[in-house]
């Protein structure tokens, strides 16, 4: 049974085809790795799978459901960038508040628990944290 199905997906940025008619099927229970040089499209396909980008053409299904603008599917996915994408002035607490508004299953109780376990000062600015 296919868990992820990518069919004929193309994504272009300023005339550069990052993905060109890509096809991929991932069966339930499988583990895949994406390997390739810079610019090969690894991050682009991940962002398409998470619904961050919308393909120019083709379709992406997870459990037979379209990903883009699908809240139920997006609740099950996360993309963690290696680049800072918060406002430079955001504190950890401010970022948590933003996420609490985006994710219906957000738990402040779990947030407080993790903050205490890892001894995190949530008043610290995100830009001051190490990766």
Q: Where does each model-flagged region fall?
A:
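Conserved structural motif at the start of ABC-family nucleotide-binding domains
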Residues: 4, 19-21
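Short coil-to-beta microelement around the adenine-binding A-loop and adjacent beta1/P-loop entry
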Residues: 16-17, 71
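Helix-to-loop junction immediately C-terminal to a conserved catalytic motif
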Residues: 50
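Short hydrophobic beta-strand immediately N-terminal to the Walker A/P-loop
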Residues: 32-34, 46
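Conserved ABC transporter NBD signature motif
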Residues: 58-73
